[in-house]
UniProtKB/Swiss-Prot annotation:
It is found in: Virion; Host nucleus. The modification Phosphotyrosine is found at Y931. GO terms for cellular component: host cell; host cell nucleus; T=25 icosahedral viral capsid. Keywords: Acetylation, Capsid protein, Cytoplasmic inwards viral transport, Host nucleus, Host-virus interaction, Late protein, Microtubular inwards viral transport, Phosphoprotein, T=25 icosahedral capsid protein, Virion, Virus entry into host cell. It comes from Human adenovirus D serotype 9 (HAdV-9). This is Hexon protein. Belongs to the adenoviridae hexon protein family. Induction: Expressed in the late phase of the viral replicative cycle. The keyword Translocase does not apply. Homotrimer. Interacts with the capsid vertex protein; this interaction binds the peripentonal hexons to the neighboring penton base. Interacts with the hexon-linking protein; this interaction tethers the hexons surrounding the penton to those situated in the central plate of the facet. Interacts with the hexon-interlacing protein; this interaction lashes the hexons together. Interacts with host dyneins DYNC1LI1 and DYNC1I2; this interaction might be involved in intracellular microtubule-dependent transport of incoming viral capsid. Transmembrane segments: none annotated. One of its GO terms (molecular function) is structural molecule activity.
Length: 943
């Protein structure tokens, strides 16, 4: 290696753009200036359209992007490992920042994938309307106890006659035949054809019905595949050997209006013919929520079953392919090693935050609300109107009517009459039939018949049920009677089958307030079909269950993702996960392993770009970078060691102890709370207990439990109080929220303390004074405190001071009685009657009330800033010395006070440390990396 004295005095050059946090350490303005005429360094060496204008010796130099095929593959049940040999030729420099893995394979999203709300089949049918069906039963009034076939249905298609051949639908007049045309039974009468207009009346009608062997389902959601090109759906009959024949399973049943006579005989000529058939009936996207009995067989009772659409479940790869590549997992890390030295430049730590760091880095570089399909970059989001309900009622001042199709709505007919000549018409005898007027005139008396529906209220109520009620915790739901659900509560079938009483989240709940439902606060709001980012990523793959995918996956590991690789030969390998719960994300969060999803990788290639430099320029750059004064240094964006501390269910206190160490270069703490169920074990290649596929806050930053913290106290063993005791509350105790606020310490009409608000403004934006100041736009990004802080308040009945208060439980509350279902999303029942809930909080009769306050702050990590200089700023002794002066190593004790939760959770605590890697490439095929981390040199925060 050349000695420094032999090298020219290069000035510094920053190659990563103004706000990038990672850059080549010393090096290269003079170099940039010298080469600027034919190669601009403007966009971090990455403009693939720029090629050198001179000194190009071969056409190979112009070939900027190369594909590397793996030299070794290892495809196992849970992972796919690909190894590449990167050969960087002389006078070339490979830009690792431009590399990506190009992966092709096949994805089966499983039967739980449903990329839409509602149903695709007969969505306009009433939820409880049956298909035209038959069943076997005894006649109710007949003495004969034999089982007979009963038919219920619609015969919509008119005809001119009915004979043994069926319904006559026309006459063949070609070649003077004049022969009747009968319905072709394999597809006629067609269900979509009927009377064409209001006056279209025939004497004979035909229709189709499902035979008793086809088990009844409501029309809403029913589908039967066609069995011929005309759209007919009848099954084929089988012969004695069980082989399918070419004959359809169709039987004609004839029906006559009872009571007619022909002469002395009873009139029995058929008026209706029903073509009964068996079909392949299925309900691909609905399920039954009301079932009168346990049997699925066709019966009169099952005519009144009621359907509900299956819950939407979008499934796609995670944001920026989180979870697809192994990071921070011992034994599964990658390799980037020079073949000459075999030293691996990738040194992984389980407590590094590679995925989360990448998410936050992207947020600092640009607008995360803009989707970038190539890296599958569409950030998880939720509809703010679902998380926090602004219930301002409905604007339904005008009634909404629906009218009969004929604009009258009556079938009453009237005889034309007139007054006899010379009479005045005041008695019946003065009237006679009018021969000039028809004997049957259809006239409507009074106003047009109409029915009223409150469209606005129904839309609002429907929104609340679909978006809020169905996402309530499972403890608020029940299984409909006579419906059997699987025991595994993580399956789609179980989640889909559970229903909730609509009155739990109705239009009158918290009316007039801006408030989130208390049970919903601790439910992951990103696991929702209105997660626009997930919906976009799901739709990128298409709308079918089976997907041949072709994706491009970036490298995120901070030490090598921006590296300039100098000439030599290198081994590069990485592991890719195949665990569907880790690499796929679903909006319901069901266990995709159990629900039949799978992934297969067919090929993993690596694409890499060389800098388009003239050879002599590249060799100059190489010579510079080989010099150890120009080693490449990279900071981890988060620069933090993380630690997960378990919080048992119902626990409210979390003590933490860190053994004595030197706190030099320590910047502070970030913390939030995670659910154990939603946090995989990164240390294992495959976590068998991770039975969940929703958003993973630990990796993707979808935090939502920040509001559950009450206090945090921080104490170093020296017991030095926090420097600069100018905070509102106790120096070493941070009170985050207080429910009883006698001193008026809360802020923004919620229960967050002014103290905590100021600490957050200080640590996020360096706004450390009390005054109105909004952070600059480039600081106030998607994951920032100011953007996500949501204060709320509401009034509720004062149960203590209102003497007439009665705690009426849900089954005994009624509101909209007669117009809604009782405690179920089923047919309306009851009678119109005054509501008994909720108590009025407004008007002349407003009852005594109390105010409740709270806040939500999602996506953010709470931060407490710290400077290791504080250790030298404690209270001075009589000698004018700091007590800490003699001993610079200190133990740390922290205590977190949190709200109790019904399930085990984790405290996710980041210690903001100095985390940097220095990469040195002294010779061909040699790459050395030094990782520096202080105060936690390696491992996790407990070592």
């Amino acid at each position: 290696m050349a000695t420094p004295s032999m090298m020219p005095q290069w000035a510094y050059m920053h190659i990563a753009g103004q706000d990038a946090s990672e850059y080549l350490s010393p090096g290269l303005v003079q170099f940039a200036r010298a080469t600027d005429t034919y190669f601009s360094l403007g966009n971090k060496f990455r403009n693939p359209t720029v090629a050198p204008t001179h000194d190009v010796t071969t056409d190979r130099s112009q070939r900027l992007t190369l594909r590397f095929v793996p030299v070794d593959r290892e495809d196992t049940t849970y992972s796919y490992k690909a190894r590449f040999t990167l050969a960087v030729g002389d006078n070339r420099v490979l830009d690792m920042a431009s590399t990506y893995f190009d992966i092709r394979g096949v994805l089966d999203r499983g039967p739980s994938f449903k990329p839409y709300s509602g149903t695709a089949y007969n969505s306009l049918a009433p939820k409880g309307a049956p298909n035209s069906s038959q069943w076997l039963a005894k006649d109710t009034n007949a003495g004969d106890q034999a089982l007979k076939t009963h038919t219920h249905g619609v015969a919509a298609m008119g005809g001119t006659d009915i004979t043994a051949k069926g319904l006559q639908i026309g006459v063949d007049t070609t070649e003077n035949k004049n022969e009747p045309i009968y319905a072709n039974e394999i597809y006629q009468p067609e269900p979509q054809v009927g009377e064409e207009n209001l006056q279209d009346v025939e004497n004979f009608y035909g229709g189709r019905a499902l035979k008793k062997e086809t088990k009844m389902k409501p029309c809403y959601g029913s589908f039967a595949r066609p069995t011929n090109e005309k759209g007919g759906q009848a099954k084929f009959l089988t012969d004695g050997d069980g082989q399918l024949t070419k004959n359809h399973d169709i039987t004609m049943n004839f029906f006559d209006t009872p009571g007619g006579t022909v002469g002395q005989d009873t009139e029995l000529e058929a008026d209706i013919v029903m073509y009964a058939e068996n079909v392949h009936l299925e309900t691909p996207d609905t399920h039954v929520v009301y079932k009168p009995g346990t049997s699925d067989e066709s019966s009169e009772a099952n005519l009144v079953q009621q359907s509900m659409p299956n819950r939407p479940n979008y499934i796609g790869f995670r944001d920026n392919f989180v979870g697809l590549m192994y990071y921070n997992s011992t034994g599964n890390m990658g390799v980037l090693a020079g073949q000459a030295s075999q030293l691996n430049a990738v040194v992984d730590l389980q407590d590094r935050n590679t995925e989360l760091s990448y998410q936050l880095l992207l947020d600092s570089l640009g607008d995360r609300t803009r989707y970038f399909s190539m890296w599958n970059s569409a950030v998880d989001s939720y509809d703010p109107d679902v998380r926090i309900i602004e219930n301002h009622g409905v604007e339904d001042e005008l009634p909404n009517y629906c009218f009969p199709l004929d604009g009258a709505g009556t079938n009453a007919t009237y005889q034309g009459v007139k007054v006899k000549n010379g009479q005045d018409g005041d008695v019946n005898a003065d009237w006679e039939k009018d021969p000039n007027l028809a004997s049957r005139n259809q006239i409507c008396k009074g106003n047009i018949f109409a029915m009223e529906i409150n469209l606005q209220a129904n839309l609002w109520k429907s929104f609340l049920y679909s978006n809020v009620a169905l996402y309530l915790p499972d403890s608020y739901k029940y299984t409909p009677a006579n419906v059997t659900l699987p025991a595994n509560t993580n399956t789609y079938e179980y989640m889909n089958g559970r229903v909730v009483a609509p009155s739990l989240v109705d239009a009158y709940i918290n009316i007039g307030a801006r408030w989130s439902l208390d049970p919903m606060d601790n439910v992951n709001p990103f696991n929702h079909h209105r997660n626009a980012g997930l919906r976009y990523r799901s739709m990128l793959l298409g709308n079918g269950r089976y997907v041949p995918f072709h994706i491009q996956v970036p490298q995120k590991f901070f030490a090598i993702k921006n590296l300039l690789l100098l000439p030599g030969s290198y081994t590069y390998e990485w592991n890719f996960r195949k665990d569907v719960n880790m690499i796929l994300q679903s909006s319901l969060g069901n266990d995709l392993r159990v629900d039949g999803a799978s992934v297969r990788f067919d090929s993993v290639n690596l694409y890499a770009t060389f800098f388009p430099m003239a050879h002599n320029t590249a060799s100059t750059l190489e010579a510079m970078l080989r010099n150890d004064t120009n080693d490449q240094s990279f900071n981890d964006y988060l620069s933090a060691a993380n630690m997960l501390y378990p919080i048992p269910a119902k626990a409210t206190n979390v003590p933490i102890s860190i053994p004595s160490r030197n706190w030099a270069a320590f910047r502070g703490w970030s913390f939030t709370r995670l659910k154990t169920k939603e946090t995989p074990s990164l240390g294992s290649g495959f976590d068998p207990y991770f039975v969940y596929s929703g958003s993973i806050p630990y990796l993707d930053g979808t935090f939502y439990l920040n509001h559950t913290f009450k206090k945090v106290s921080i104490m170093f063993d020296s017991s030095v109080s926090w420097p600069g005791n100018d905070r509102l509350l106790t120096p070493n105790e941070f009170e985050i929220k207080r429910s009883v606020d006698g001193e008026g310490y809360n802020v923004a009409q919620c229960n967050m303390t002014k103290d905590w608000f100021l600490v957050q403004m200080l640590s996020h934006y360096n706004i450390g004074y009390q005054g109105f100041h909004v952070p600059e736009g480039y600081k106030d990004r998607m994951y920032s405190f100011f953007r996500n802080f949501q204060p709320m308040s509401r009034q509720v009945v004062d149960e203590i001071n209102y003497k007439d208060y009665k705690a009426v439980t849900l089954p005994f509350q009624h509101n909209n009685s007669g117009f809604t279902g009782y405690l179920a999303p089923t047919m309306r029942q009851g009678q119109p009657y005054p509501a008994n809930f909720p108590y009025p909080l407004i008007g002349q009769t407003a009852v005594p009330s109390v105010t409740q306050k709270k806040f939500l702050c999602d996506r953010v990590m709470w931060r407490i800033p710290f400077s290791s200089n504080f250790m030298s700023m404690g209270a001075l002794t009589d000698l004018g010395q700091n007590m800490l002066y003699a001993n610079s190593a200190h133990a740390l004790d922290m205590t977190f006070e949190v709200d109790p939760m019904d399930e085990p959770t984790l405290l996710y605590l980041l210690f903001e440390v100095f985390d940097v890697v220095r990469v040195h490439q002294p010779h061909r095929g040699v790459i050395e990396a030094v990782y520096l981390r202080t105060p936690f040199s390696a491992g996790n925060a407990t070592t």
